[in-house]
Amino acid sequence: PASPARSIYEECLAMADCYLTWDRADPAAAQLLEALIREIGQLPLDGRGGPRCMVNTELNSGNFLINEETRSYLVDWEKPLISEAAQDLAHFLAPTTTFWKTDTILDREAVGRFLHAYQRAVNGRSDTGALAHRLPLFFTVTCLRGVSWCAMALREYDEPGRALTNPDTLRKIRAYLSEDFLRHILENYVRRDFLRGIVS
């Protein structure tokens, strides 16, 4: 897409609308989701960023097959795009990704260590200069994408006669839509630049 951050944001609007128009939506969750949409919508979503490259778009730790003595692989390329590296980095590090399978939310120090290691590993093969201003933007839209997907999924899970249900997935979806989690995303990743000073 010409504007990857805008594209993600628009995808989020459609997913969130499924929940926001649902008569069983939790009012507190709906209000916080609307605040996220409103405030993230005011960010420079159409700005140009770093060099374009192929991105996985759903990068998480489970997609890496690490082999000590032979080649390692990145798998699960269902939705690759030409975008910016910041899109995959944000998805990999965002709390909406790390919390899904591991119940872990990376703190600033852990994210900083990862980003410094990433920049050392790139070692000039690609321009990482745009990360300082693009990564915070992708962090916020990635967080919105995670909670919007959960909002849509909760409505789908509630449909009568749903054939497939997974209690662990449902528990996690509800955790993402809790007032505490949504407020954490809003206060720490939207209203505050979580990455300030750790991305150079």
Residue ranges and their predicted role:
Residues 38-87:
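Active-site acidic catalytic loop and adjacent metal/ATP-binding pocket
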Residues 1-31, 45-46, 50-52, 81-82, ...:
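A cross-family kinase active-site recognition segment
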Residues 24, 31, 146-200:
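ATP/Mg2+ or Mg2+-diphosphate-binding catalytic cores
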